[in-house]
């Protein structure tokens, strides 16, 4: 099983001072690190948040965060999933189930994981899996 790592998993994996570092690292070491994926949205989110000087554990400019993440991407267990789907595809998404604009990215990531026959690994318990056809099977919520 390939796990698409949500931004809320990637950040604590790279930030050892993050409140969820132990949970993320423990799960990744035991389960997720055996076969995992990133995509343009998760990589962009990681760079955007961790390179923001207002981030509590600011680690540097985007180029520095990218270098740190590239180390992880070079793992043989890593897969890169390109953006190959659309929220407008009724074979993947039930757009009527997306009730808030803030949910769009999470639903898209869940749909991408489902499309790739993987799972979205996240700490977020609020993702509406009904917005993705077969979404419940593709959602893997990690305990904090």
Where are these regions (language model features)?
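Short, well-structured N-terminal submotif of metal-dependent ribonuclease cores
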Residues: 1-38, 50-64, 132
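A generic structural signal for short hydrophobic patches within well-formed alpha-helices
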Residues: 10, 43-46, 127-128
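Acidic catalytic patch
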Residues: 16, 37-44, 66-98
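A generic structural signal for well-ordered alpha-helical segments
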Residues: 31, 72-73, 113, 131
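Amphipathic coiled-coil/heptad-repeat helices and related helical stalk/stem segments
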Residues: 24, 105-106
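Acidic, PIN/NYN-like endoribonuclease modules and their adjacent C-terminal/linker elements
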Residues: 85-99, 110-144
